[in-house]
Amino acid sequence: MRHAMRWLAGGAILLALAAAQLAPARRSDPPESAPLAAPSPVLKILTRSCGDCHSNDTRWPWYTSVAPVSLLAIRDVEGGRRQINFSEWSAYNAAARRHKLQWMHRALGSETMPPWEYQLAHPGSHLSAADRATLSRWIDAELLSAASGK
């Protein structure tokens, strides 16, 4: 009896996963309307390690077309874009840019970005100490520039 119930439950789960593949994932990549203007080394690091979730130029690997991974990936990208979107950077007002720079500084310091699960799937996304130093210097310069009203 127990054995049959396990097979039934397993079959129901497989059926649900198969049915989930029929609903297309709603991935979006809106055009970049006001992209970030930053030095080339900074842009290179941000594109490599942050761009998939924090820009409108997301690279969607094949596995993001498979439910339920597709739903998780879409949720993460939408959340990342809401937090900070480098494709919309120039459209943020000065206070919003300052807030987002401070958030980036905290994320760099705590090493919470990029998330470990993203780094597992994207080995090249890891931020080295040199990458963190480059980004930190740029953030400090941007915050100083914002404070002086430039």
Located regions from the model:
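Residue-level detector of conserved, well-ordered beta-strand and adjacent loop positions
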Residues: 87
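N-terminal secretory signal peptides that target proteins for export/translocation
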Residues: 1-2
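Sequence context surrounding c-type heme c attachment/ligation sites in exported
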Residues: 6-84, 94-149
